[in-house]
Design a protein with these regions (language model features):
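Intrinsically disordered, low-complexity regulatory regions of eukaryotic regulatory proteins
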Residues: 4, 37, 64, 78-79, ...
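Acidic, low-complexity intrinsically disordered segments
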Residues: 89, 93-96
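Short aromatic-glycine-(Arg/Gly/Cys) micro-motifs in beta-strand/loop hairpins
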Residues: 46-76
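A short, exposed loop/beta-hairpin motif centered on an aromatic-Gly-Thr core
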Residues: 70-88
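Intrinsically disordered, low-complexity cationic segments
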Residues: 29, 39, 66, 85-87
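Negatively charged, low-complexity tracts enriched in Asp/Glu with abundant Ser/Thr
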Residues: 2-41
Length: 98
């Protein structure tokens, strides 16, 4: 059964709404990273999986004109698949930020 974005967000402990600054602070202590990409914040996070594919991608969108680290963002998408590293997870996120 395919998980919804809400279910995946809960599994990875991703906030539905936040700021880029808070998201980065949450992810950086666990091998994660974020990248500003136009109106989007792209995230690659780590969540242990014994099969070795422990990275996931996520896409957030700015909800206001404030695109600084304190602007409001909302979760748009979380990858169905997991990846072997954060580069592949970030590539997935870039492909979804349209």
């Amino acid at each position: 059964m395919k998980k919804t974005t809400d279910q995946k967000a809960a599994a990875y402990r991703l906030p539905e709404t936040t700021t880029p600054e808070n998201l980065e602070m949450k992810l950086m202590n666990n091998l994660g990273t974020i990248l500003t990409f136009g109106d989007h914040i792209l995230a690659a996070g780590y969540f242990y999986d014994p099969n070795g594919r422990s990275y996931y991608g996520a896409v957030y969108r700015f909800t206001t004109e404030d695109h600084t680290c304190e602007g409001d963002i909302k979760l748009v998408s979380v990858s169905d698949e997991t990846f072997i590293d954060n580069g592949h997870a970030m590539a997935w996120a870039m492909s979804k930020a349209n």
